[in-house]
From Swiss-Prot:
Domain of life from the UniProt record: Bacteria
Keywords, in A-Z order: Hydrolase, Manganese, Plasmid
Native source organism of the sequence: Rhizobium meliloti (strain 1021) (Ensifer meliloti)
Protein family per UniProt: Belongs to the metallo-dependent hydrolases superfamily. Adenine deaminase family.
Protein name: Adenine deaminase 4
């Protein structure tokens, strides 16, 4: 309570004066929806007064001149798998703080499937040493896959009981609709534990309408970020949800989702907020982060006030953290953006946790990553593969086999459909066929629990030769590899195993590009600009193999997600995401045994 007393005394005009004062700016008050002249007094990391702050200024108060500029709250990303950026939290802070993002809401689920709650605790302790804030949602369970795939840690009801008291915990996160539909016992227990701790349920229900939505709403879900059409978003809004607009690096929904405002006449703008879900460094550095979403919304005709609310207070209210962040108000964390022009919305300076963190798009404070635990640096535990392992056997007598290929297209981001193809058979093995745009895909379980490494086929990557592979691949972070040549695929996979994770391109027996991701096999401490350069080189190397997708590695690494229809690929094999079963690529109309082995 000593801190509370200290803030009360400072805010009440006592002897303690403001440590920082932001003076001369025009305040964008997202609560009262006004813009007016006001100064802001900050004591340590908290706002203590707004308006006339003359009595709070002392001889040691640092004055920040904001004359002729606007003051807006720091922005909040309402749903983000931050590890999918491949940046550690320290490096991610370097990427987004200069762009005005001062808070993110994340389940840290990708590091949890690798190292469990201890790994998440390491990440949360790490971010405390930066000006960025992480509000943590305890994943409803991990993995999210159905049927359940193999991961390093299964986040269970016991984990919920053990972590809900963490100060960063704000809810039950990524509550996948299928878990509610199937009455998954672990998830229902997690919700009950959360209810006992007064924590909200945060959703994940793409393409959910009608009776399915009604059933899903019985879980008490408060917010959802997965609307594929404005009609779907409107139905969820009418059902009582806070709706979160997603604009990620790979899926661009903002322009379509916000038609509920610009074309469908929705007035409840305070129930609409922003998230980016999955972003990569090259996209952040080229387009921006939440600042880009604000500009996009205004370009559609949304008012500056409403667009800024969507990036700040609306998300805070949806997550029930508006007493901490989301507005420039007494008692809130001192996260303030200084903006020259609201419509241009370029961030001139960022005050985060009461100190200037960035100016003119650059960090002005030095962020140093922590020493990493040995467990996170040695998380890839599988044995090497051979080219002979990457095969789909065929016992028939015909020279061709009818198979199901998991098809991806840039027109339907995330959605994987079925493509029936006829492939050649040689020596009892079904071969991929580049002339038909069909490649091999395999997922190698990398935690040393099994010898699972099923092989199937994908279509849409258009690889003419070589292979691409990644050990960061939500929701399991098992090694996924796509290729035209089994030998190159084996080299790619084994390179990741030998280096404890990363992303790699191999062609004609040679590693042509490699990004090392040593922390849990999924993230790195390198700076955002260096990461962006690696991403561009990796994607360009994939394009030289023939891939013409806009983000080759992102299209590959989401193939393990079973919460999005119609098909996925996990360490159990091909998943029919609609009927929640494993199927054989040779028998797409019926279930088949998974090609799995127990580890010896």
């Amino acid at each position: 309570m000593s801190d509370v007393r200290e803030f009360i005394r400072a805010a009440s005009g006592g002897e303690s004066k403001a440590t920082v004062a932001v003076c001369g700016g025009r305040l964008v008050n997202v609560v009262s929806e006004e813009i007016y002249q006001a100064d802001v007094a900050i004591y340590r990391d908290r706002i203590i007064a707004v308006g006339d702050i003359s009595e709070y200024i002392g001889p040691q108060t640092e004055i920040i001149d904001a004359a002729d500029r606007y003051l807006t709250p720091g922005m909040i990303d309402g749903h983000l798998h931050v590890e999918c950026s491949k940046l550690s939290l320290t490096s991610f802070a370097k990427a987004v703080l200069p762009l005005g993002t001062t808070s993110i809401v994340s389940g840290l689920d990708q590091i949890i499937v690798v190292g469990g709650p201890d790994a998440a605790r390491e990440f949360l302790d790490e971010v405390r040493q930066t000006p960025l804030k992480v509000f943590w949602g305890a994943p409803c369970k991990t993995p999210y896959t159905m049927p359940r795939s193999t991961v390093g840690h299964y986040f269970s009801p016991k984990d919920h009981r053990d972590t809900h008291h963490w100060p960063e915990c704000v809810g039950i996160w990524e509550t996948v609709r299928e878990f509610i539909q199937e009455e998954d016992e672990d998830v229902l227990q997690a919700i009950e534990i959360g209810q006992a701790n007064r924590l909200p349920v945060l959703g994940c229900c793409p393409m959910t309408r009608g009776a399915r939505l009604n059933g899903y709403m019985q879980s008490g879900v408060r917010a959802d970020h997965e609307s594929y059409t404005p009609e779907e978003m409107l139905e969820k809004l009418r059902a009582g949800m806070h709706v979160v607009v997603r604009e990620s690096s790979i899926s661009h929904f903002l322009s379509d989702n916000l038609r509920i405002v610009t074309e469908m006449g929705v007035k409840a703008l305070r129930r609409i907020s922003f998230c980016t879900d999955d972003v990569v460094a090259s996209d952040i550095l080229s387009r921006g982060h939440l600042d880009n979403m604000v500009r996009m919304a205004m370009a559609m005709g949304i008012s500056p006030m409403a667009a800024i609310q969507m990036a700040t207070i609306n998300g805070a209210e949806a997550l029930r953290i508006d007493h901490k962040v989301g507005s420039i108000s007494p008692g809130r964390t001192a996260d303030i953006l200084i903006v020259n022009d609201l419509r241009d919305f370029r961030i001139e300076a960022v005050v985060a946790n009461g100190t200037v963190a960035a100016r003119d798009g650059r960090m002005v404070v030095k962020l140093v990553p922590p020493q990493r635990s040995a467990g996170l640096l040695r998380s890839v535990k599988t044995t090497p593969v051979t080219a002979a392992d990457i095969a789909v056997p065929f016992t028939g007598t015909t020279p061709f086999a009818e198979v199901l290929a998991i098809a991806v297209t840039p027109e339907k981001v995330f959605v994987r459909t079925r493509r029936d193809v006829r492939l050649p058979v040689v020596d009892g093995k079904i071969l991929a066929d580049a002339s038909q745009n069909v490649q091999y895909v395999t997922v190698v379980e990398r935690y040393g629990k099994t010898l699972n490494r099923p092989v199937a086929f994908v279509s849409g990557f258009n690889l003419k030769s070589g292979a691409i592979a990644s050990s960061t691949a939500p929701d399991d972070n098992n090694i996924i590899c796509i290729g035209a040549d089994p030998q190159d695929m084996a080299i790619a996979i084994n390179h990741l195993v030998a280096n404890n994770g990363g992303q790699v391109v191999v062609d004609k027996g040679e590693v042509v590009e490699f990004l090392h991701l040593p922390i849990g096999g999924i993230v790195s401490d390198i700076d955002p600009a260096e990461m962006a350069a690696f991403e561009l080189r990796l994607d360009e190397a994939a394009r030289r193999l023939g891939c013409d997708l806009p983000w080759p590695f992102m299209y590959m690494f989401v193939l393990q997600i079973t919460a999005i229809p119609d098909y996925a690929m996990t360490d159990l094999g091909v998943v029919d995401c609609v009927n929640l079963r494993i199927i054989s690529p040779l028998a797409p109309d019926g279930p088949a045994k998974a090609n799995t082995l127990a580890a010896e």
